[in-house]
Structures are given as structure tokens and as C-alpha cells.
């Protein structure tokens, strides 16, 4: 595995790979690799001849009161995991090479990036869209693998790729869960043992939604309220939001229509730790 830190060098390598008809897959991360990331790399490895992994803790997607400086950066451990996962190129630039002093241009995501996570984290998705676009231009992949765990981020990226006519296929990888249903996440390290033991409540909420829909219950607002109550009644937990959205448009939905696909989005706090989860629901 070759480690690259300079954007121009990575671009030159990617251009040469394309000229040599190599099929490139990219996985973009902020490091602190876990089983979820490794599943994305595995999917890329199965789908592409050359796999590029990016590690970059993107400052433009962190808010003023968020944990940019506390975000874990176990680089040597990440290198070992990436090597074992048979990554071909690890692109790990410094912030100054991606956002030099005179950098001014950013992307605006519109309404999709302003609700739910975007409402609670103003500017977050603009930062995500900007860095993803930059990394796509630098690594020049044919496919890019993103996890379904960050469902709104995935929707924003798909919308951006379509709107900007970017020449890349976005592939979604399923959520990887722990035994109790907790979605694997870099933020799980902040959970106490007690919080981790009860963290399956979010997945239980998804299961409750699936069961309710299977029983022909159609009022999604009522189901969402029931899940909120489930979370609120779990010691140490408080819900932030529980919302159903139309899977195609990613707009809030209140009544389920037969045969239509929805996405249940959940965000909740365990103490000071904020976690998100989601599940696909078919009416």
C-alpha cells in the first residue's frame, strides 16, 4: 500500500491508473477505522481493480461547538487496518493542502442539506459536499462507496452527483451493527458501558416501525411518536428526532402508501453522546 499526502501526486496517480484502464473505487473516511469502514473497503475491493482509501478529518463539516480537535486520529492503527484490507493507495492529506489560506469556494446543498441533521448542524452538509467533490476530483474514481448509516449524507451526495453531472457511480453499503443492534460508529467509543448496553434502543425503534407497518398501521407520525417514547423511557437516553422520509425524495412523510419505500431516521443522546441511525421501511 502506498501512502500519499499531496493532492497533485494523488491526481497524477489516478490519471495514470485511468489511462491504464484500471477500474478505481474510493472509500472516503475521517479515519478511526472500524468494522463499518472495513465493510466499505471490502465492497470496494470486490468491485474495483484499484482501491483508494482517503483519511481526512474535514474541518469544514464541524460546527463551532463540535468535536473537531477531540476527534480520534489513530493513524498508525488505521494504516495497519488499511494494509490488512488490501487497500492500494491511502490518501491522507494535511488540512492546509486541501484548504489553503486563499480557499474560498464551497458548495451549497439547498433544502436537502438544511433539514434534520442540517438544521441541527448548520453548514455541515455544505462542508461534506465540498470535500467529497474535491476528493472525487483528486482520486478520479469510477465508483465511490458510502455507508447507509449516514442516510441523509448519502442522499446529499447522490443529489450532488446528479446535479453536477459528476462521472462517478455512488454505491451504498449496508449498516454494520453490534450484537445489540447498535450501528457501528466512530462515536461509539464515547459511550459508557451502561450507555452501550442500552444503545440497542435505536435499533429496537426501527424494528418497532417494521412490525407496525407489517400490521398495516399507516400513520407514520403516530409510529414515530411511539418510538420517541421508547427512547425517552430508556434510562440515560433522550430523543432528538424520529422522522419518516420518502426514500426517493427524502422529504418528511406522515401517512404510508402501499408499496412505497420510506426511511426511518433517528437521532438521540446518551448523556452527551449524540448517535444517529436509520432503517428502510417498505409499506
From Swiss-Prot:
Beta-alanine binds at residue 61. HAMAP family: PanC. The active site is at 37 (proton donor). Keywords: ATP-binding, Cytoplasm, Ligase, Nucleotide-binding, Pantothenate biosynthesis. The gene is panC. The keyword Ligase applies. It is an enzyme of class 6 (ligase). It comes from Pelodictyon phaeoclathratiforme (strain DSM 5477 / BU-1). This is Pantothenate synthetase. The reaction proceeds by a bi uni uni bi ping pong mechanism. ATP binds at residues 30-37, 147-150, 176, 184-187. Belongs to the pantothenate synthetase family. Catalyzes the condensation of pantoate with beta-alanine in an ATP-dependent reaction via a pantoyl-adenylate intermediate. It is found in: Cytoplasm.
Amino acid at each position: 500500500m502506498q501512502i500519499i499526502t499531496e493532492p497533485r501526486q494523488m491526481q497524477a496517480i489516478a490519471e495514470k491508473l485511468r489511462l491504464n484502464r484500471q477500474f478505481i473505487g474510493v472509500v472516503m473516511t475521517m479515519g478511526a477505522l472500524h468494522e463499518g469502514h472495513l465493510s466499505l473497503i471490502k465492497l470496494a475491493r470486490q468491485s474495483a481493480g484499484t482501491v483508494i482509501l482517503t483519511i481526512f478529518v474535514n474541518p469544514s463539516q464541524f460546527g463551532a461547538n463540535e468535536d473537531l480537535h477531540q476527534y480520534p486520529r489513530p493513524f498508525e492503527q488505521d494504516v495497519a487496518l488499511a494494509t490488512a484490507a488490501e487497500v492500494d493507495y491511502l490518501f491522507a492529506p494535511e488540512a492546509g493542502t486541501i484548504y489553503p489560506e486563499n480557499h474560498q469556494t464551497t458548495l451549497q446543498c439547498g433544502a436537502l442539506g438544511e433539514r434534520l441533521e442540517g438544521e441541527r448542524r448548520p453548514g455541515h452538509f455544505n462542508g461534506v459536499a465540498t470535500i467529497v467533490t474535491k476528493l472525487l476530483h483528486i482520486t478520479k474514481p469510477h465508483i465511490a462507496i458510502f455507508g447507509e448509516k449516514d442516510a441523509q449524507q448519502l442522499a446529499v451526495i447522490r443529489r450532488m452527483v446528479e446535479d453536477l453531472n459528476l462521472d462517478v457511480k455512488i454505491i451504498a453499503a449496508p449498516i454494520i451493527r453490534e450484537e445489540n443492534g447498535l450501528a457501528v460508529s466512530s462515536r461509539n467509543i464515547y459511550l459508557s458501558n451502561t450507555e452501550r448496553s442500552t444503545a440497542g434502543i435505536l435499533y429496537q425503534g426501527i424494528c418497532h416501525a417494521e412490525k407496525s407497518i407489517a400490521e398495516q398501521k399507516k400513520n407514520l407520525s403516530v409510529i414515530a411518536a411511539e418510538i420517541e417514547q421508547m427512547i425517552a423511557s430508556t434510562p440515560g437516553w433522550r430523543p432528538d428526532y424520529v422522522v419518516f422520509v420518502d426514500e426517493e425524495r427524502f422529504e418528511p412523510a406522515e401517512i404510508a402508501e402501499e408499496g412505497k419505500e420510506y426511511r426511518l431516521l433517528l437521532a438521540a443522546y446518551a448523556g452527551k453522546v449524540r448517535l444517529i441511525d436509520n432503517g428502510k421501511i417498505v409499506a
